[in-house]
Amino acid sequence: MISALAVRLPNWLGDTVMAEPAVRGMRRAHPQAQVLLAGPWATVLGGQGLADTLVTYPRAWSGRLAAADVVRRLAPDTAVLLPNSVESALAAWYWGAGRRIGFDAGVRGKVLTDVVALPEPRRHQIDEYLMLAERCGASADDAEPTLTPPPADGAARAEARALLAEAGAHGGRRTVGVHLGAAYGPAKTWPAERVAELCRLLDTVGARAVLLGTAAEAPAAAAIAAEAPAASLAGRDRPALLPSLLAELDALVSGDTGVAHLATALGTPVVALFGPTDPALSAPRGRAVALTHPVPCAPCFYRVCPIEHPCLRGLEAKRVRDAVLALLKSAPPPRPALRQQ
């Protein structure tokens, strides 16, 4: 019987969201166990009844050592390692976990006690995480990430609504977020002229486009908003506010990003644009549609396109608009206009 279970979460936001079904399955399989989740985005899975303890596992090595000590004090008897790194396997050994479950990826297999062979061909990331959860006794009967949004009457949701109202949203119109960035690299980014065209097309059908992204994307978002009917919240959608902001949207358009996975898990419909990566491996599951433009070089998995970016440049704004409208047809009616305070 497992009494203390430590789960090393992936390092990226989207991968962490895709790990939710596996974590949920392990929690259900071992209700008596103390469950600890460790990873850079562990707090994303907080408040969901999935864990007793969350440990933010930072990227900096100095911070990781301190976090490893926190996990070690829990004295886990079992560790499930979702990343395929040597570091995660060594960390589990340092934690003192007698049972260490992970994929056989290179030399790390020598540190694991339960080695799971990577599937060939590779499967969707969600399904691969579920393979590890099954080794831990979990069921793989639910493979769709689900997160409960922040409370509608909470402070974070109120702040999100205020930001959207400032951006001209929720005036009885559909609000469509358009996320510009991708931590993976510029090869995942839809061209700015396509984004501007989408904003114009959405405006013609009575929808308000709101541009999202980090502070690094703020200049590009401002340039788009200057020539198209859209407002920019880029740089203002900080991580702590992001779940509330996404929950307030009627739909989201995004590249293959963690934000797309988070929005879908929260119940917001998503149109995900895929170029250099493979939707068969990482498309959002739920109320989402993945769009691609077939070209011979895709998926290349390059972070920077060495040619003219044909995969995403070939995705026409009208096609994206039509996909958004199809999702909105099955969505609840738009929210009423906000009262002026």
Model features per residue range: what roles?
Residues M1-Q341:
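Catalytic machinery of carbohydrate-active enzymes
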